[in-house]
């Protein structure tokens, strides 16, 4: 037993010694474009923390007027103040948005449209992970509501402004976890069977399928859309799982920082020449492969129609 513990300790010590080299290998791609955003308007959901916050920081640094749309306004204001001080850009604004509540989503959109006549970039960044089973006030399972339906509705409500401001982009944060996902139309809300891990995977697959179908419907409008896997990032997304929090802490030297995790979102929001790749899935700042289920056009169209029915909207 002592020998095993000794070997394990030696192995972990070795890993931590070579951690900088491993970190450099897993850091991933970097957004290389020097595009400036003076006069441009951006909305980022969940930008009060993590990847979203770093994305907002970089877009503000480039001169954009950035709206941090988040549930916790106090944390949002704290993030905005930090970004303003760091970038010397005072145009970082915070607005209340609870993606688990369709009334909040509609209120945010109504306020934004009254306030702004342009919208050039929408980044659907917010998300939840590994939540115990629960339903929102609208009767939707939490992962489905926040990660998919909330952003589906928000994009629907803001799309007119995006079209008016074209060229414009919609970036949807997904995950490599979509490979384990399946759209279970017979039990979309998890009433018959629920697993908090798979619920997250299903919602991330929904993000990729939404992006695929949205791109098809936006052809010729000047608005393009991209799905993004940010990488395995040191963030608070795993806060609902004690085991993952422990693993994240143990392996934190090997995980991406939030700055690194933001790079692919920035690439898809800013890089020149991406228009022909609308609807595609990106990781480490390049197009990458998706699961067979994520390439199913019939599933994408059906999910679109079911989402419209659940939300009571008609998407022209």
From Swiss-Prot:
EC id: 1.1.1.300
Record organism: Bos taurus
Coiled coil, from the record: none
Catalytic residues as annotated in Swiss-Prot or TrEMBL: 200
Residues given in the record as NADP(+) binding sites: 46-52
Similarity-based family: Belongs to the short-chain dehydrogenases/reductases (SDR) family.
A family per Pfam: adh_short
Gene Ontology biological process terms from the UniProt entry: cellular detoxification of aldehyde; retinol metabolic process; visual perception
Record-level Gene Ontology MF annotations: 11-cis-retinol dehydrogenase activity; all-trans-retinol dehydrogenase (NAD+) activity; all-trans-retinol dehydrogenase (NADP+) activity
Tissue expression pattern: Expressed in the retina.
Reactions catalysed according to its record: all-trans-retinol + NADP(+) = all-trans-retinal + NADPH + H(+); 11-cis-retinol + NADP(+) = 11-cis-retinal + NADPH + H(+); 9-cis-retinol + NADP(+) = 9-cis-retinal + NADPH + H(+); a 4-hydroxynonen-1-ol + NADP(+) = a 4-hydroxynonenal + NADPH + H(+)
Binding, substrate: 175
UniProtKB keywords: Lipid metabolism, NADP, Oxidoreductase, Sensory transduction, Vision
Name of the top EC class for this enzyme: oxidoreductase
Name recorded for this polypeptide: Retinol dehydrogenase 12
Note: Shows clear specificity for the pro-S hydrogen on C4 of NADPH and the pro-R hydrogen on C15 of retinols.
């Amino acid at each position: 037993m002592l020998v095993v513990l000794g070997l394990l300790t030696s192995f972990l010590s070795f890993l931590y010694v070579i951690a900088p080299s491993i970190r450099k290998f897993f850091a991933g791609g970097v957004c290389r474009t020097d595009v400036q955003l003076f006069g441009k308007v951006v909305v980022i959901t969940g930008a009060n923390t993590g990847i979203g916050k770093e994305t907002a920081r970089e877009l503000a640094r480039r001169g954009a007027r950035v709206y941090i749309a988040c549930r916790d306004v106090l944390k949002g204001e704290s993030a905005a103040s930090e970004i303003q001080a760091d970038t010397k850009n005072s145009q970082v604004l915070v607005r209340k948005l609870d993606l688990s509540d369709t009334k909040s989503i509609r209120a945010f959109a109504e306020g934004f449209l009254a306030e702004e006549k342009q919208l050039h970039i929408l980044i659907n960044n917010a998300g939840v992970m590994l939540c115990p089973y629960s339903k929102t006030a609208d009767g939707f399972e939490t992962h489905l509501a926040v990660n998919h339906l909330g952003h589906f509705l928000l994009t629907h409500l803001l799309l007119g402004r995006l079209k008016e401001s074209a060229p414009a982009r919609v970036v949807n944060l997904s995950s490599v976890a979509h490979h384990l996902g399946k759209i279970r139309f017979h039990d979309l809300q998890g009433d018959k069977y629920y697993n908090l891990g798979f619920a997250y995977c299903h919602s991330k697959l929904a993000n990729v399928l939404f992006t695929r179908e949205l791109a098809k419907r936006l052809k010729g409008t000047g608005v393009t859309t991209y799905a993004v896997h940010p990488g395995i990032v040191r963030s608070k997304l795993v806060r609902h799982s004690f085991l993952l929090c422990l693993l994240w802490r143990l392996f934190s030297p090997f995980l991406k920082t939030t700055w690194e995790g933001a790079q692919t979102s920035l690439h898809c929001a800013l890089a020149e020449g991406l228009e022909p790749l609308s609807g595609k899935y990106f990781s480490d700042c390049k197009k990458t492969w998706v699961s067979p289920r994520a390439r199913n056009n019939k599933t994408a169209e059906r999910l679109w129609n079911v989402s419209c029915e659940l939300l009571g909207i008609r998407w022209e």
